[in-house]
Amino acid sequence: EVSTNEFKKNVELKGISIIGQNDEICPADKHIYSIRDVTATIESYPLICASIISKKKAEGINALVLDIKVGNGAFMKTLEEAKKLGNALTNLSNSLSINTEYIISDMNQPLGFSSGLWCEIEESIMFLKNEKRESRLNQLVFKICSTALGLTGQKNQQKIIENAISSGSAYEIFEKMVKSHKGNLKDSYLK
């Protein structure tokens, strides 16, 4: 687990980090979730929005791409539900000066050629190394990344993304992030 200070330092020095909810980042979120759980309001759109967007606001981000999953492998089962949630999240986030767009992705089948946490991590690493890129996963990665680049004013998004993957820089950045979190890809995966 990464502390809030380590997270900030990693973002400052390396430009990338990940962090989960903790006592410093949206401490009320776990309490809101437990209330949703005992009051049968897990599916409450306003509470879902409050949970997700409060963390994003606390992180201090300026732009956000939300990937709303829909289908039998997702929380949102219908396209209508996914659009309703996407619009609610986007409206709230934009009202807080976070430039936000959402996309909807189909979870009625796996995105890649494998499923299961370890297998999906392995596939993600292979993707970043440009060793194996399954079509559906490739399309979703390009859609999310091009939307994110567009939100920041970047042009030639497809070219930037392809270059990051084919040059190995996407994997190198991922590897730096893993190391900054005290992980070791060489010992853990893909020997």
Feature names for model-found ranges:
Residues 1-59:
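Phosphate/pyrophosphate-binding betaalpha-module
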Residues 12-14, 41-44, 48, 55-191:
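Well-ordered secondary-structure scaffolds
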